[in-house]
Amino acid sequence: MAEKEVPLTAVKVDALVVMKIIKHSSQSFPTTATGSIVGMDVDGTLEITNSFPFPVVEMPADSHFDNAAPNPAAAAPRAKANVAYQAEMIRMLREVNVDANNVGWYTSANMGNFVNMNVIENQFFYQKEMNERTVALVHDVSRSAQGSLSLRAFRLSSKFMTAFKENKFTSEELQKSSLRHQDIFVELPVEIHNSHLITTFIHQLQCPSQSTPTDLPPSLAALEKSSFVKDSVLAPNFDNLSLSIDPFLEKNCDLLLDSIETHHTETNNFQYYQRSLAREQAKITAWQAKRKAENASRAALKQPLLPEDEYQRLFKLPQEPSRLETMLNTRQVEQYSRQIDSFVSATTGKMFAVKGNLLPGETAK
């Protein structure tokens, strides 16, 4: 009996691969950067040991949706030319005794806007055609520029894979499968790993020489003029009380408002479909009632009855629009909301401090 396959639980990325992805994404910014990642699967942990970028080619004509925005760089991972290029690169890596197992691809993002049709189609292609145990690494260039590396690993859930393969995103099908926008991606924890040689080299690096001990200042004036105090983060600094909004937070709010507006547009389109469907069904009901009354009269006169299913030829019900775009937009709204929640704490604290000083009676309520 074959052993049960261990599900993927984590992703371990070499530091060199992270630096390659950061360099490629920064050089291509604001254009989307994509590339392939190779490594091995060790007991449910996907170890990524190497990467290489994709050349930009034209978007394939067989896109899942005709209204998808053409983006050659974002569509590069599933292009036929790049599939052959990737196979040739992996063959060359295997010849020099490097881990040459395809474990997924990477892409760059700006302000967390990676929930789009290109990412879905690319990851669907990898999990369906290349290797089911693959991941998509998403590097957010703008978030990383704030001083914190943003590198996340995603897979498409099995429930979403089934729905996307059959292209069943109507309201009825979504209710049957209980598919929600939270079920699109499965996020895996990412761990950055260094080899033992690199770790040993880092420990052997010389630490900066300690500065000479400073004498205690004789007075408060001398303390305020001391260069050590001016350079210290603990020194009194009124700039920390500035209420200026972080540009990253401001841009995220703008993108969130745009996504909410898109959500309202999709909702209005679906409501228009429901109104059109109700009108056509009312016409069909009226026609069927009229035909039944006419057949009753003909039956009384012993005349041949008229067919009652002729309405299928006379009336055409409107086709329900796909709910996939709405699901993706909802998932993107959730992504923007999480980013705003993580960045808003510092500004919110300052605003409450100002309110407490200006309106001391309000804080007690």
UniProtKB/Swiss-Prot annotation:
PROSITE patterns: MPN. The keyword Cytoplasm applies. It comes from the Eukaryota. Residues 11-160 form the MPN domain. Component of the eukaryotic translation initiation factor 3 (eIF-3) complex. Belongs to the eIF-3 subunit H family. Component of the eukaryotic translation initiation factor 3 (eIF-3) complex, which is involved in protein synthesis of a specialized repertoire of mRNAs and, together with other initiation factors, stimulates binding of mRNA and methionyl-tRNAi to the 40S ribosome. The eIF-3 complex specifically targets and initiates translation of a subset of mRNAs involved in cell proliferation. PANTHER family: EUKARYOTIC TRANSLATION INITIATION FACTOR 3 -RELATED (PTHR10410). This is Eukaryotic translation initiation factor 3 subunit H.
